[in-house]
Regions:
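A domain-start/cap signature at the N-terminus of enzymes
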Residues: 17-53
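Alpha/beta-hydrolase active-site loop
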Residues: 95-116, 136
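Short amphipathic alpha-helix adjacent to the substrate-entry channel of hydrolases
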Residues: 67-86
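C-terminal catalytic histidine-bearing segment of alpha/beta-hydrolase fold enzymes
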Residues: 96-97, 229-243, 255-309
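Short beta-strand-to-loop junctions in surface cap/lid or active-site-entrance loops
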Residues: 39-51, 109, 115-116, 219-221
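Short beta-strand element of the alpha/beta-hydrolase
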Residues: 51-61
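Primarily recognizes the serine-hydrolase "nucleophile elbow" in alpha/beta-hydrolase
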Residues: 113-114, 120-178
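Mobile cap/lid helix-loop segments that gate and shape the active-site cleft of serine hydrolases
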Residues: 62, 171-223
Length: 309
């Protein structure tokens, strides 16, 4: 698609991120043997022997498995800890239709069965729009008895979780007329959201039915099955960077709505919610400074979370 580069913090979907240069994998005494399986729609790296956990990753709007590997270099740490890693090529989704949820859930379960992966310690996570997919598909799987791959935990990395806010932010960007790329992306977003849901002023319920979170109405109906699931919400609220580079206000940033979501989940009794804001960790794999990046995640800490250490 012409606008496949769309990312979104400031509610514009951007390409992914960079490995945190300060994290280094700790060597193990014994090299764990791994099997690499590459298919058209996914890539799987699994230990040949004991598997202590399964990590399923979804990339940002235009990202496939190769880009995820480049921007989120967690393979070595996962390997050292006997964690299987499934990198999905499923992308370009700001929300999921019910049919898409079913097809994706079935696909994931088929992969897990086919590759004899354990189902008791599955974690799902994603960057940007991939985080939206992660939350929505996890909620769907847990709510459907025919699926038995319930995620034990789910995490997002600076994801555009509020579609209503995304629509309104796009209107601001066009009115502000700050940069041509921003204007073009916002025009595309208004078109795709408007065509599917209309204007949120007139059709807020349609937005609520599809979004992870609608801040203006405090709606989290698409996360109701995750009340006992471990949840991590990563974001880097660098207001100065966004002001200088996009002329974006804090209320236009993914970080603003991620924080609001964490507060709403905790208030409503969700058992294990962690809001994780970072400072100066956002860099792309090419060294470019960008707070909207995979690299804000501490990979070693994430693995410890998966292993419950």
């Amino acid at each position: 698609m012409k606008k496949a580069s769309i990312l979104l913090l400031f509610f514009i979907v951007v390409v992914s991120c960079k490995q945190n240069k300060h994290e280094k994998a700790q060597p193990t005494a014994e090299k764990i043997k791994f099997t690499e399986i590459i298919k058209e729609d996914y890539e799987l790296h699994k230990p040949s022997e004991e598997i202590k956990g399964v990590l399923i990753l979804f990339g940002g709007y235009p990202e496939n498995a190769d880009v995820i590997k480049r921007e989120f270099q967690i393979l070595d740490i996962a390997r050292e800890n006997s964690i299987a890693e499934l990198l999905s090529n499923f992308n370009q989704k700001l929300w999921l239709e019910k049919s898409e949820k079913y097809q994706l859930a079935k696909k994931l379960q088929d992969i897990i069965i086919e590759n004899k992966l354990p189902t008791e310690n599955i974690f799902v996570g994603g960057f940007s729009s991939g985080g939206v997919v992660s939350l929505l598909i996890s909620d769907f799987i847990i709510g459907m008895k025919q699926f038995y791959i319930d995620p034990k935990g789910v995490f997002i990395v600076d994801s555009p979780i509020d579609l209503t806010a995304l629509y309104k932010s796009s209107e601001k960007n066009i009115e502000r007329n700050f940069s041509e790329p921003s204007i073009q992306e916002s025009i595309w977003l208004l078109e795709i959201l408007g065509n599917n849901f209309g204007n949120p002023k007139d059709n807020i319920a349609k937005y609520e039915n599809s979004a992870v979170f609608t801040c203006s109405t405090n709606n989290i109906s698409n996360l109701k099955k995750l009340k006992r699931t471990k949840i991590r919400l990563y974001t880097e609220p660098d207001t100065l960077w966004w002001k200088e580079n996009r002329m974006a206000d804090y209320e236009q940033m993914n970080a603003f709505y991620i924080k609001k979501l964490s507060e709403s989940l905790i208030e409503k009794g969700y058992e294990s919610v962690e809001y994780i804001p970072t400072i100066d960790k956002g860099y792309r794999a090419n060294g470019e400074r960008h707070p909207h990046s995979w690299s804000i995640v501490d990979k070693k800490d994430l693995v410890n979370w998966i292993l419950n250490k």
